[in-house]
Design a protein with these regions (language model features):
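Exported/periplasmic ABC-transporter solute-binding proteins
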Residues: 4, 21-287
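Hydrophobic alpha-helical membrane-embedded or membrane-associated segments
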Residues: 7, 11-14
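C-terminal motif of bacterial Sec signal peptides marking the signal peptidase cleavage site
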Residues: 16-20
Length: 287
């Protein structure tokens, strides 16, 4: 009799586990592995702002309330690898960095596509900005004119971003010199493409791009350690007060990503907020 009862219990347990996995190898009762970008990342700053993942101290100071249990990654590439190798992970990155190794979920029923970003339906969007000083070199000014031109706009659009600048037609001045660019790993892919195409028209110009994060890029521009700082977040007033100006060059979306085995197709903004605050711990608990 005891053996029979034990056998029944075992069969029920196996059946429950099988059902919870939804025949896909994904167990909804497992804990969510929260993955975030590092502090200083413009993508993290924009993500926290867009999903309102903030709290206040008793003195009223606002701070990033991302759970302390989140795993931290230093780049979009590491984020992709981390989520693609963990069935229960959730992360976020630039829409333009998406690939087939992971899956982007819809937010509030809207897919993260360039068209949805452009028409305003996808709300999880941010600006790509550059930080520069007024006293730029002639060659740096020329490169920015190129970015603003119809050529620059076309490159930005073809690369999957939303162009926002409208400048004059670009005519090369055949300048020479070096331009140093530093900052966001999210902005760097489009900046590298723009730089490559610009140098084809201006063979005596060398553009050197160093990838770090938004805060480092902005600080480098302020300190004169680079000509152009790249930022995937809004450049705040305290930074602008240090002698730089902000130029928006494109718009991009932030996609929330999960493992390909994950059965979740859509998340509400409030669910993402709860997950990243550490209030929602298991996939099965998502409301």
């Amino acid at each position: 009799m005891k053996k029979t009862i034990s056998s029944v219990i075992m069969l029920v347990t196996v059946a429950l586990i099988f059902c919870s996995c939804n025949n896909t190898g994904f167990n909804e009762s497992r804990d969510i592995t929260v993955i975030s970008r590092e502090e200083g990342s413009g993508t993290r700053a924009s993500f926290v702002e867009l999903f309102d993942i903030y709290s206040k101290t008793t003195s009223g100071k606002i701070y990033d309330a991302t759970t302390d249990y989140a795993d931290i990654t230093q780049s979009s590439g590491v984020m992709l690898t981390s989520v693609s190798t963990n069935r229960y992970a959730i992360g976020y990155l630039s829409v333009n960095a998406l690939n087939d190794s992971i899956r982007a979920v819809s937010i509030d029923g809207v897919e993260p596509t360039t068209d949805n970003i452009k028409n305003g339906d996808y709300k999880v969007a941010r600006s790509f900005n550059i930080a520069v000083k007024d006293e730029l070199s002639a060659v740096s000014k020329d490169f920015i004119s190129y970015i603003k031109s119809s050529i620059g706009r076309e490159i930005i659009e073809k690369s999957g971003y939303v162009a926002v600048l409208e400048g004059d037609e670009y005519v090369t001045k055949k300048l020479s010199g070096k331009i140093t660019v530093n900052g966001s790993s999210s902005v760097s892919p489009i900046m590298e493409t723009l730089a490559e195409e610009y140098m084809k028209l201006n063979s005596k110009v060398k553009i050197e791009i160093n990838i770090s994060d938004s805060s480092t890029g902005i600080t480098s521009a302020i300190n004169g350690n680079c000509d152009i700082g790249m930022s995937s977040r809004t450049i705040n007033q305290s930074e602008l007060n240090k002698g730089i100006k902000s130029i928006e060059i494109a718009k991009d979306g932030i996609a929330v990503i999960v493992n390909k085995y994950n059965t979740v197709k859509n998340l509400s903004s409030s669910a993402v907020n709860s997950i990243y605050r550490g209030d929602c711990l298991r996939w099965i608990d998502i409301k």
